Amino acid sequence: MATPGLLYVTMHPRPSLPAAQFHDWYNSEHGPLRLRLPFVTNGFRYRAVDGEEPEWVAWYDITEMEELTRETYLALREDGIKTPREKATMAQIAVDRRLYDFLGEQKAADYTPLEDQPDTTVAGSVLVAVSTTLVDDADKEADYNRWYTEEHIPMLSRVPGWRCSRRFVTAAIDPKAPREYLTLHEYKATNGLGGPEHKAAMDTPWRTRIVNDTITSQRRRVFEWAYTFGPAPRELSSLTSKDVAGPWSSNDGRTRTLPSPTRPAVESFVTTADGVDLPYRLEGSTDPHSPVIVLSNSILVDYAIWDDFVNAFLADPRNQGFRILRYSTRGRLQACGKQPINIDVLASDIIALLDALRIPQATLIGVSLGGVTVLNTALRYPTRVTRFISCDTNSSSPESNRKAWNDRVAVAEREGAVSTTTQETIVGDELAEVTVRRWFTPESYETQPHLPAQVKELVRTNSLEGFRQSVQALCAYDVREQMAQAQVPGLFVAGNSDGVLPKTMQQMAADLKGDAELKLIPKAGHLPMVENAPAFTQVVNEFLHK
């Protein structure tokens, strides 16, 4: 039977450690690594408001305490994963790490776990942490436990703003640690601590007897919520400080922070419920509550196709308050899961990104396969999407499309190109050439040949297995019926030279409930954000700022 518990860590940075470095390390490196573990269900940082030290505490709920003795967790503290930055940072922090087994909890009727609440709701929340040691007497210890559960917590529950009280005791996996009880009391930002109900709970005959006869030491600390970890880094605010040395990279190169006084960024990955890693880049506003725009790619490329658009968009002073989240869709890499890929799976991937990065809602922009993905996400998850722009796509795809796409897969299979870095089979030159010729206008090959060349390289290097699996999403879907019931406002966009799409997307705009428009981008084919980024950016700005 599993033993749930708590990893409870107090920290006090030395004066030599810049605050920005401390927060960047903790929020982008240390915390998310632990939240990626399946037995770590949440993690929080709190800052002291009682004027005492240590100044900071972090705690993590653990589903099975034995996991903290096993290699998966212990590896986080070894050189393979522990970076030089982590070592240098932790050398400037006084750390006290304690392990506790869970005993029980009492919660308010309307209690919602902190990790399930938006950060804007949690802000100001108070944590009262009480550490207690007792005399070595089993009967008195039993009396203490009865008092806490039968009188003390029920009386605290009458304090305005009380949310939850959770009790722990020193973990069995830490037999050398002195036996200690820890109770965490959670309160809303507006609460009755120090008021009459709280004073009544602290002044009863039973409590007086416990304090006089049973408790040998007790420390009460008061903290305020500072940060809720997710399984992927999202910290941008610290990266504007000159005190953050960068850029920084994890030892495996999969996570990077890119400091900048004007446009910091973090790059990492989110793991979906079925184990697929989705690389992403988050940049823009350093306000953690600023609105987010999610960009969803076409098939066969990565999020670099948005470079020119992002540069143009963020250069506009009106857009300084936005964050932009780009990601490489399922199928860019070889490992793309075992379930059949369809537009519902791809929509769930966007939600997985939002959840991991603790983004309640976002504006979505997508092109081609990404275009129908953002449309479908808005239809399936309307409470998570504020608005969407669907580009160069269709609302339905007949089964006959399967043969066309399978023929394209066969072209790549015949070439048998292999990556020189990973040794895996990739799409190769032949299919890349015909694909990009179809996507771009002939004029672009004459006037800006670097653009099709860049996209061709992205297509050429796409995993063949990823292409083989993800292309199935372009076969046999139909969202027209759902569009008639749409709840989220949308805009449709197409390159004016993208075949029949300027005509068929006019019908898509008519089919969407809510008077959607179609905007055409001049001098552009299938990827207007690449081929004519200024005109595409203007259309996006008009939609967002109208």
Regions found by a protein language model. Name each.
Residues 499-505:
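Conserved alpha/beta-hydrolase "acid-adjacent" motif
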